[in-house]
Amino acid sequence: MAATTTRPLPLLLLLLLPPLLLLLLSFHAAAAAAAEEFPRDGRVIELDESSFEAALGAIDYLFVDFYAPWCGHCKRLAPELDEAAPVLAGLSEPIIVAKVNADKYRKLGSKYGVDGFPTLMLFIHGVPIEYTGSRKADLLVRNLNKFVAPDVSILESDSAIKSFVENAGTSFPMFIGFGVNESLIAGYGGKYKKRAWFAVAKDFSEDFMVTYDFDKVPALVSLHPKYKEQSVFYGPFEGSFLEDFIRQSLLPLTVPINTETLKMLDDDDRKVVLAILEDDSDETSSQLVKVLRSAANANRDLVFGYVGIKQWDEFVETFDISKSSQLPKLIVWDRNEEYEVVEGSEKLEEGDQASQISQFLEGYRAGRTTKKKVSGPSFMGFLNSLVSLNSLYILICVFALLGVMIYFTGQDDTPQVRRAHEE
């Protein structure tokens, strides 16, 4: 039997251990120093090419405004960021707000694809996500808080459920699973992260069954605090049924049509049963909306919306309806260039409007309709017009200004003007 020889590996490790420990300590000290270098007290910090990478390494959630000193939109954004910064820094997952003069540090801006001002990006552990949401301080906080929240929150008590609902606010719908396995909704929590809150309640009292109107588990409760709506899904939790419920519940049962909700419809492929009213804020209209809500709950394959000609006559007139038309009317709109009128159900009369809406839906599903074209722009055209008109005016002014500068100073001396991002 061959004799075994003792290898010097343990001795080598003993010799290497002190320098390895020193190296690790130096890394830790460097990271701590970098973290202390950037204030966490809610101030907006100014970064340059030399400090930017260090900030990415030291700050888990860094919200960066790539700006230009001459940009008017950037100047209007600055006080909103100043207001939002201390609130964001105080979140359970703090977000630090920073700004970079990307007109001066163009190489840094180019690295992250900055081609206009302001460009806003949230860096999550160094990975950039462009932010294109609202720039108002309160909505900015709500939206960014949504970015850093877990895909699905785990709630272990009644107080945790209450805190989750309060902290989520009213900007996004919520889905809370009671007795639902987390794995069933985890994928949807990631897929629809930017559009809704998701949570699973592990432990809860019967009080919440009363509050959210469910009588058995598993149950997935959908909440729309902004519209004071809620609904319950009892399954089945397999196949496409669960995602269909989630996708259809991202919108409230009855959608008030305005510039904000019109954009939300772009992510939904259902047709819209649209009630056109004289004034969507009066008592008669409010009663009709309640009837529409009941119909919407039973017809989830359609979106139910309403709009008042008093509130938005420009939009209503695209359906060949004017202030002299007899209202309310019901149509089915494909969200683009066509809509359908149901024969014999063009106008809702006073009386039993629930029965009239049922007859309207029956006629629509039976194909007793007349198709018409919208008289204005298509859905996408109307959406684009909400933004493009202001952009067009700005571009005209910019080109006019450039023309004057070229005329008086010569083309060679004309400074480069980079594009500004509107909200």
Curated annotation (Swiss-Prot):
UniProt keyword Metal-binding present: no
Keyword annotations of the record: Disulfide bond, Glycoprotein, Membrane, Redox-active center, Signal, Transmembrane, Transmembrane helix
Residues modified by glycosylation: 181
Catalytic residues in the record: 71, 74
Main location: membrane
Coiled-coil intervals: none
GO CC term, one of those recorded: endoplasmic reticulum
Disulfide feature: 71-74
Pfam families in UniProt: Thioredoxin, Thioredoxin_6
Function: Acts as a protein-folding catalyst that interacts with nascent polypeptides to catalyze the formation, isomerization, and reduction or oxidation of disulfide bonds. May play a role in storage protein biogenesis.
Protein name, UniProt field: Protein disulfide isomerase-like 5-2
Organism annotation: Oryza sativa subsp. japonica
